[in-house]
A protein has these predicted regions:
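Conserved active-site-proximal phosphate/metal-binding subdomains
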Residues: 77-92, 196-220, 228-377
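Active-site entrance/lid segments in N-terminal catalytic domains of soluble metabolic enzymes
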Residues: 1-216
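Residue-level detector of alpha-helix initiation sites
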Residues: 149, 227-228
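Thr-Gly-centered strand-to-loop micro-motif
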Residues: 13, 32, 145, 223-224, ...
Length: 377
């Protein structure tokens, strides 16, 4: 709270600009995920946030991998498409057709448009620098890299502008590397988390990292992974975290960018209905189980390709499936999936993002008072 002058240390990772604004205005801290956005869309969205947020602090989350296929080469969509074996086109088309969707356009990659390539562009060195330049031209307070140690040039640029740099980590080894690199904030993401995540649970990870980084000074830790309410947040802070970083809890909010069909699937799901798989991006990421994920986990499935090629395989057919699912297509409804953590089982209704923040505050106080009562007895 001191680092960013906020009322409550609840950080909202989200692909929805409305959630960023709502959470920051409610006393938390909104973090906008650039993900696969084009430079133009990212600029438009940050301008909108600047106009709506009323001077409250916010941040951005970027995907800048330290290991990506031909990362230092200029982005060339045709060259990347040519690197994808033809059987991947047939495989994705077959999945669609088994669910009553025409897959003929997806048997080759020639017709794939730029929609599925935002992530591929942004993980190239030139694309990474472009997206960072856009972010730094706005009054952000935090920039987070979600894939490995931030490049030196990013740390230097942020420092010049007085912007804090955070990093996602999934082990104490990663925490030490980030601390040595000079990051200001660590987001310790347990395996319960949605999206790209490691194998260690949040309950184990927080105290382990808390001890591991003591020699490096007072670097705040945000707990991430499975945290869906204020009581869990209080528990994480009792273990050494300075706040909570949450993503899944915003997915079913009224403001969320997700289509209604996806929100309904999440509200109906239990905590066992997620899977950590390489099938979406080429790196392990947790998502809701669906017919699409099951097809990639089958014994006869193809091995996922490295980032960014796997995203280029999966995004175009899933974009089509989402459109059809919104129109009521039953096969498409079975296929659609989205990144979400194991805490999905705690998503029971759709409320506003500001109401989620308020519920977190109340739950945090309840959790704190419960612990205090034990000490009084």
């Amino acid at each position: 709270t001191k680092m960013f002058e906020i009322e409550f240390p609840l950080f909202a990772f989200t692909h929805c600009r409305d959630v960023v604004v709502a959470v920051s205005k409610a006393g938390g801290f909104g973090v906008y995920a650039a993900g696969g956005l084009t430079n133009e869309q990212f600029e438009i969205d940050l301008k909108w946030i600047d106009n709506e947020i009323g001077g409250r602090p916010y941040g951005v989350d970027l995907l800048i991998p330290n290991k990506s296929l031909a990362q230092d080469e200029e982005f060339d969509s045709e060259k990347l498409k040519a690197m994808i074996p033809k059987e991947y086109g047939d495989f994705r088309a077959d999945i669609l057709e088994k669910h009553g969707i025409d897959g003929s356009d997806f048997r080759s990659f020639e017709q794939d448009d730029e929609r599925g390539m935002g992530l591929a562009k942004n993980t190239k060195e030139e694309g990474s620098k472009n997206i960072v330049d856009i972010a730094l031209s706005h009054p952000i307070s935090l920039i987070v890299n979600a894939l490995g140690v931030p490049p030196f040039w990013l740390l230097e640029l942020a420092k010049e502008k007085g912007i804090k740099v955070g990093a996602m980590i999934g082990s104490s080894k990663h925490a030490i590397k980030q601390a040595e690199a000079g990051v200001d904030l660590l987001i310790a993401s347990g395996t319960e988390a949605g999206g790209h995540t490691g194998e260690v649970s949040t309950m184990v990870l927080i105290p382990e990292i808390f001890e591991a980084i003591k020699p490096y000074g007072d670097i705040p830790i945000l707990a991430a992974g499975g945290i869906m309410n204020g009581q869990q947040m209080a528990a994480a802070m009792a273990m050494g975290a300075g706040g909570a970083w949450c993503g899944s809890v915003w997915l079913t909010t009224i403001e969320s960018e997700l289509p209604l069909v996806m929100k309904e699937k999440m509200i109906e799901a239990n905590s066992s209905q997620t899977i950590r798989s390489k099938s979406r991006t080429g790196k392990h990421s947790r998502q809701l189980v669906s017919s699409w994920t099951e097809a990639w986990e089958a014994p006869d499935a193809l091995e996922p390709l490295p980032m960014p090629l796997q995203t280029m395989v999966t995004d175009p057919p899933l974009i089509k499936a989402f459109k059809l699912a919104e129109g009521g297509h039953e096969g498409a409804k079975e296929l659609v999936t989205y990144w979400v953590g194991q805490g999905v089982g705690l998503l029971k209704h759709s409320i506003s993002a500001s109401d989620v923040v308020q519920e977190f505050k109340e739950g945090f106080i309840d959790g704190y008072e419960r612990l205090h009562e034990f000490m009084q007895e």
